[in-house]
């Protein structure tokens, strides 16, 4: 849950606890955000409304639309935000060969968002500044639309017209923006709740849920989040390390697969290069490899939240204590 607190007493005006997995994920995303943008925060045990819990303390003023978009650009790699790849190609390529020009134009037209800005403009090898100016002048809009269509929509509601609650303050009794929790409180029935108890569903909305996407680790099709709502420092450490280990293990697996494919191609008399983009590794395989090698960073069994891009809901896995001993 999130609370307004006295800034004069605590040095911050907002406190948030990991009351369920949505708030745990939001806290993890907020921690990435605060660290990247060097904003002040504190993790502290407090008693609020007669509830003693571990809280993340921060100031509302440190969360702005502009900072959020800047964070998105810093957080995600070039293969996720293609405009970053285009900028890198234009800024650091010394000689624009026909093949490179073709590749840049391919990236420029790689998604609907970029097509809207470059419908009448193509790169010809001489108009680098013009392309970069378009990207720079429309950067935040490009980031926002790319993020909503490729990433945010996997975790929060975005309709066919691109409308969402991104950047919107939560209103009283407004439906939750998180996928699978989008119930109308005014019409909420027992059928929406576990064991037919209407109070068992936490359907309230909160603007901090906009930070949920950053908490998940994986690939473009499936992601996971390790939920520890007992200790925020352990929650932070586990998910930060998961992100690091996942990247390392993914690179290792892809390299192994590419080597095997290349060896097979050579045996068959083919001399075609194997592109990294043509190789995929399942999330479960990578995660199991991490558990075998890096169990030291997981302290005890816990809830794992899983999201498949093709499904409109989240799934829950459980990691038992005896499975990591």
Question: What is each of the regions a protein language model found here?
Answer:
Residues 34, 146, 242, 246, ...:
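Hydrophobic, Leu/Ile/Phe/Ala-enriched alpha-helical segments that form helix-helix packing faces
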Residues 1-152, 319:
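Conserved small-residue
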Residues 102-259:
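Basic, glycine-/proline-tolerant helical and adjacent loop/strand elements
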Residues 252-325:
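Intrinsically disordered, low-complexity regulatory regions
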